[in-house]
Curated annotation (Swiss-Prot):
Ca(2+) 2 binds at D109, N111, N113, E120. SMART domains: EFh (SM00054). It comes from Oryza sativa subsp. japonica (Rice). GO terms for molecular function: calcium ion binding; enzyme regulator activity. Ca(2+) 3 binds at D149, D151, N153, E160. Ca(2+) 1 binds at D73, N75, D77, S79, E84. This is Probable calcium-binding protein CML11. Residues 44-53 have a biased composition (Low complexity). The keyword Disulfide bond does not apply. Pfam families: EF-hand_7. Keywords: Calcium, Metal-binding, Repeat. Residues 1-22, 40-60 are annotated as: Disordered. Ca(2+) 4 binds at D185, D187, D189, R191, E196. One of its GO terms (cellular component) is cytoplasm. The gene is CML11.
Length: 211
């Protein structure tokens, strides 16, 4: 893999570099979606989650969720099987074990038909989307993306990712680099688009918040 031509990166606030280094680390846990329903969650956290369940998601958030849902509803029947839900979560950088996936299905499947309809999917993830420590705004994600997209062509290559992570003090092994590209590159074209980057960053941020 050849090293990209050296260019002067666009100056960015130090916080953006810290956020990029943190958010771009591979996700390590999948307890994000179930932690605050467990008995170990504090009463204050549970009260916050209950209040947020009563708040509506914005149209943009619902649209994004519907797009994600449809992309994994392979037979277009308006519901996800356990296998499809597992694939969806893995595409977001989460790594559910079989037991964790079973727990999610049991919690979300309110009509007990063994499938997850869109309304059940929204009910599952809405509290995390509305949590007061929500992940980065689109503007913040765009700034992070621009740090890595060194040639400004709208895509992040493996070389750009490796170079930028090294400059941020997180040099990657070949295995780590390959793994990160594989996690984020959902369409398999060998590079990361802004949409893919946004999903990967959001998933990693949720994982850091709730782990």
């Amino acid at each position: 893999m050849s090293e990209p031509a050296t260019t002067t990166p666009t100056p960015t606030p130090a916080g953006d570099h810290d956020a990029a280094a943190t958010a771009c680390k591979p996700a390590e846990t999948t307890t994000a979606l179930i932690t605050c329903r467990s008995s170990s969650c504090s009463a204050q956290q549970q009260q916050q989650q209950q209040q947020q369940q009563e708040e509506p998601l914005g149209d943009d958030q619902l649209g994004e969720l519907r797009e994600i849902f449809r992309s994994f509803d392979r037979n277009g029947d308006g519901s996800l099987t356990q296998l499809e839900l597992g694939s969806l979560l893995r595409s977001l950088g989460l790594k559910p074990s079989t037991d964790e996936l079973d727990s999610l299905i049991q919690r979300a499947d309110t009509n007990s038909n063994g499938l997850i309809e869109f309304s059940e999917f929204v009910a599952l993830v809405a509290p995390e989307l509305l949590y007061d420590r929500a992940p980065y705004s689109e503007d913040q994600i765009r700034r992070l993306f621009n740090i890595f997209d060194r040639d400004g062509n709208g895509f992040i290559t493996a070389a750009e990712l490796a170079h930028s992570m090294a400059k941020l003090g997180h040099a990657l092994t070949v295995k780590e680099l390959t793994g990160m590209i594989k996690e984020a590159d959902t369409d398999g074209d060998g590079r990361i688009s802004f949409q893919e980057f946004s999903r990967a960053i959001t998933a990693a941020a949720f994982d850091n918040i709730f782990s």
